Amino acid sequence: TRTSLALLVASVWRFLVLMVGKAPSRAVDEWRSGLQLWRSRSVTREMTQRLQDFHAQCDPDDLENTNRLLPSRRSVWARAVDRYAGDLSDRIHPWRNEDGTTIDDLTGDDFTVRDHRSVVNPYTVMVSLMVVIGIVACRGLYGSGRATSTWLAPAPCGLAGAWHRWLTAVPGLSGGNAPWLAWPAFGSVLTIGEPEVLVRILFVVTPLLTAMSAHRLFRRVVGLGTTTVLLASFWGMLPVLTGGLARGSVTALALGVILPHMALHTWRLVNPETVDVVELRGAGTGSHQVGGVSSAGGLALWSALAISLVPALWVYPVAVAVGILMTRPRRLLLGSLVVLGPLLVISPWIPRLITEPGRMATGAEPVLSPAVETRAGLWLLVGRAIVPGTAPTAFTVIAMAPLWIAALWAVWRLVIDRSASIGSLTGHPRGRVLALIIVYLVCLVLTGVASRTLVTVWNVQVHPAIEPWQLVGAGVLLILVAAARQSAMLQRAEADHFPADESPTLGQLLVGIGNRWLPWVLTISVTASGVWWLVGGARGPMSTTAATRPAYVTAVEDSARHTRTLMVNVHRGSAHWNLVDSNNPSWGSGERPTISSDSRIADLAADLARAVATGAVPDDLADRLSDLGIGHLWLRGAGADVVSQVGNASGLTVANTDPTTTVWTVDGHPSRALLSSRGSSQVPVTGKVTESGTVTILEPRDHRWRVEVGGTRLSPAVRHGIGESYQVGSARGDLTWSMPTQRWAGAIELVALLILLVVAGPQAAQR
């Protein structure tokens, strides 16, 4: 019975693997064989008994010698590891055992001349250099404090804080949180619960990850070689060159990794009949044909990750699905998978997008830094649409000009030159090349429009997403260059069969010159970008800063009173303010209203901030601050007269932290929870509730609040002012309140992502 059960479990396991590998016929065979073995377990038991009887009659020495001939478990694992290491070595060094010498070379008069290939792998060189440069370039991030930038909020404290930002509901807002917040939550697990360590590591390795992602695409198009590595390296430098790294832009850094995978699966879908150039170059060891369903699943998977950052990028899978249905009308399943798969992943987030449609056009953390300086016009051609963090003009011109030269050569090669090979990446004569050119022009227009217009997101004016269209536009140029390079390689292979006395045409000469100089042109772009990365690509707005609020302020925020701090910064005649607490700002703070989702709290806080910035404070300033649960007032950059006028208000205790910053403590121990008993006014709750009455939490209105006293959940009461009220009744003990954890949203996102991951997986061989 034990043997039959083991065979049944093995059959079920193979059944699941084959179903994941999209081979249902073989999976059914495995299932049937497993059931047949289990039903005939009496036969198995009889055969086992006969085998035991036979062994009992044999000489023990003979049995031992026979067992030595059988492979041990250690040898099986050793063979598997050796086979994997051999395949990996063949992929890294595909020409290690080849010297390009044929039998004709050996039998000719000049057989001593051999065409040796170098064993130096350009890909290994790229990885090594980018690791070293990344470590040196991020030298300013090593030390204490938290890394912050234009679009990078401070990391939360600990693993629980990272998961809290993803799964905890936001009061006053419907739907789940932005799905991209799951990435740092899971990433913090890998860094042993240290989100700040995750941030530092990602700043060092993100350009490398971006280049590796692009290398997978370009090696599919061009094959292995120096040109492929240069194209991938330049793509990896784009977030550095355009300032995405220095700004801490999650959108730019993540899309740098995501977009090449989307392009790769699109290429497989649109050109299913094309041959992988890597196989032609001899590096196709262990490769297999990727099915249409796997490619559609891969595109849906990576598109889901992209639209969790920029929902407007959903137009990409929609456009691909339309193209699929136009060329292959019967592939409705593929089109539906590409379009609906990403929506399934972000479905918990859709209700929030519907209530705030402006978020669909922006990138991650849109309201974190709304007042960002942008440019339009010719600056768009060199990637300077967003000013903060972007490389200086000299570096961008030196880096982008060679790319433009290579792109113009590619357009001439693929569109104008009549001798261009048709069977390249485009798959059809010039039509899809023109489509790529149109895509680039559209991206250029969208970048210009986004840099000049504003959209409203949670009552804040912000620019639409600019970085995605910058990256897509630059990626189109690189794909055109890769396609032209592939076309030139194919024509060069065809030219080897021409008669020796035939003179090359002008087009063939220009192709040869361009093909010969293309690596050097790309080297200039990569070198300029790398120098800027090394000098200042990870600096600018990026810095590591200690807590801007004194320790005694943060201690009160973390206490049972859970107070807020009103921070006002006066700079060049304009005032900026924020209402912070122990959890904000942090990851995801730019995905929700800046001050509060309750307009009454936000308006009152804004009125107080403007009054503090100008010095025209009311006499009851301390009472108004206390009514909002504000325990401290932080002011920086104001003149001495403004500081004096604010300090004259009663109920405030002043403390100067530095020459430009002043902090006032609100007297009376304010709290975000108030208790009102019969016949008495509201008093702040400092931790425990010891009498009956009504508890009011100064939070945005939301029926999902869970308020407990000593573990007993309180029932809601009528409240006409700010906050939510609850009846204490007979409950006594510590007062706690929290929003629910949206496990359902996380489960939907993870299950949908897992389904797409299975669909995108490799396909098992069919019968």
Report the location of each language-model feature:
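Start-transfer (signal-anchor) and selected internal transmembrane alpha helices
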Residues: 101-139, 758-767
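Active-site-proximal, structured, solvent-exposed surfaces of multi-pass membrane proteins
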Residues: 670-767
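Membrane-embedded helix bundles of polyisoprenyl
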Residues: 207-220, 224-327, 334-350, 525, ...
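Membrane-interface coil-to-helix junctions
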Residues: 135-210
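Signature aromatic-anchored transmembrane alpha helix within multi-pass, membrane-resident enzymes
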Residues: 488-532
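Active-site-adjacent helix/loop segment of glycosyltransferases
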Residues: 1-39
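Periplasmic/ER-lumenal interhelical loops and adjacent helix-loop junctions
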Residues: 110, 165, 338-424, 547
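Extracytoplasmic/lumenal acceptor-recognition loop(s) of multi-pass membrane glycoenzymes
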Residues: 557-628, 713
